[in-house]
Amino acid sequence: MNKNKKIVVGMSGGVDSSVTALLLKQQGYDVVGLFMRNWEYGIKGSQCPNRIEFEDAKKVGALIGIEVRGKDFVKEYRDRVFDVFLEGLKQGLTPNPDILCNKEIKFNVFLNEAKSMGADMIATGHYAKIAKYKDHFVLDTPKDNTKDQSYFLHALSSEQLSHAMFPLGDLTKKEVREIARAHNLPVSDKKDSTGICFIGNQKFDEFITQHLQAIPGDILDENGKVIGKHKGLVCYTLGQRKGIGLGGIKGNESENNTHKPWFVASKDVVNNTLTIVQDTNHPLLMSKTVEASHMHWVLEEAPKVGDKLMAQVRYRQQKQACTVVEANEEKVVVEFDNPQRAVTLGQSLVLYSGDYCLGGGFISFYK
């Protein structure tokens, strides 16, 4: 029944995309693997091991009996993801390149490439599900809540989702690895990739300062007193604890006379100052009201004022209850039942109705 349906699988050389290809092959689809080369190996600070990952993908393809091709999307990734990421950092924001990559590359230029290859659908190893809700294709919560990637996929349109498959949506990560081992896939025990692809194992600030100018400035305490110097605002994000480069201040020791850790509370781009506080739940780190702009609504309509929804302000955060205070096509304001820690400008606020993802936008204000 599926023999005439051609599926192009985005293969990364990891266990998730490999098992995705295997499952679809077993289901009788005409499967072709396509490895995306999104980053130029050797670009300043780059640590993306493209060649190794491509070889792993081809080994899996040979084992399960599918062709695996490679395609260069370096220019598109640079223009639509990396440059946008850098511009956001310059403005004092903390953009998420994975969200941009899914919207602009994997489910856009990759999808178009797959169509040119005669594909009926594309498939990836994301942990998510697709459902029909109010005549639209929407993201649904996967079986493995700990791996739920709908946060990264929230900017996809119903049209994009109509051409996509997520075969791992009904599996746990443990089950995926068990399937890989049972079929002797060479990547069955390969570690999951973490962090931002193009940064690799480097420290964030070491990589970023190769691409953006870091201008040192004053570090302030909550009262506005200068207590140190920062390396450049592009090197920090809200809630950050490590790498601030400031020890304890006399008079702020804890009961056992050890210095309390510092946390980044805010960045002032205009004055080039970094405000830090002590106490992981300091009031300056907590917010109940969050505004997001540049909204993408999967249902093509905003929720209503007063709607009770669930939301995430970062990946892997447990979904939090909130109430819609204001909403239109471009903007939404929600008030959380409980204060949220380290809400960050430029990150995404993603909203859910039950298990369905309604969409999201870039955080533009919080208090």
Swiss-Prot record:
Keyword ATP-binding among UniProt keywords: yes
GO biological process: tRNA wobble position uridine thiolation
Any one GO molecular function term: tRNA-uridine 2-sulfurtransferase activity
Stored Gene3D superfamilies: Adenine nucleotide alpha hydrolases-like domains, HUPs, Translation factors
Keyword line: ATP-binding, Cytoplasm, Disulfide bond, Nucleotide-binding, RNA-binding, Transferase, tRNA processing, tRNA-binding
Domain of life: Bacteria
Subcellular locations according to the entry: Cytoplasm
GO CC, alphabetical: cytoplasm
Active site feature: C101 (nucleophile), C197 (cysteine persulfide intermediate)
Binding residues annotated for ATP, in chain numbering: G10, M11, S12, G13, G14, V15, D16, S17, M36, G125
Catalytic activity: S-sulfanyl-L-cysteinyl-[protein] + uridine(34) in tRNA + AH2 + ATP = 2-thiouridine(34) in tRNA + L-cysteinyl-[protein] + A + AMP + diphosphate + H(+)
EC nos: 2.8.1.13
Enzyme class at the top of the EC tree: transferase
Region described as Interaction with tRNA: 147-149, 314-315
CDD domains, alphabetized: MnmA_TRMU-like (cd01998)
Function: Catalyzes the 2-thiolation of uridine at the wobble position (U34) of tRNA, leading to the formation of s(2)U34.
HAMAP family xrefs: tRNA_thiouridyl_MnmA
PANTHER family on file: MITOCHONDRIAL TRNA-SPECIFIC 2-THIOURIDYLASE 1, TRNA 5-METHYLAMINOMETHYL-2-THIOURIDYLATE -METHYLTRANSFERASE
Name the record gives this protein: tRNA-specific 2-thiouridylase MnmA 2
The organism of origin for this protein: Aliarcobacter butzleri (strain RM4018)
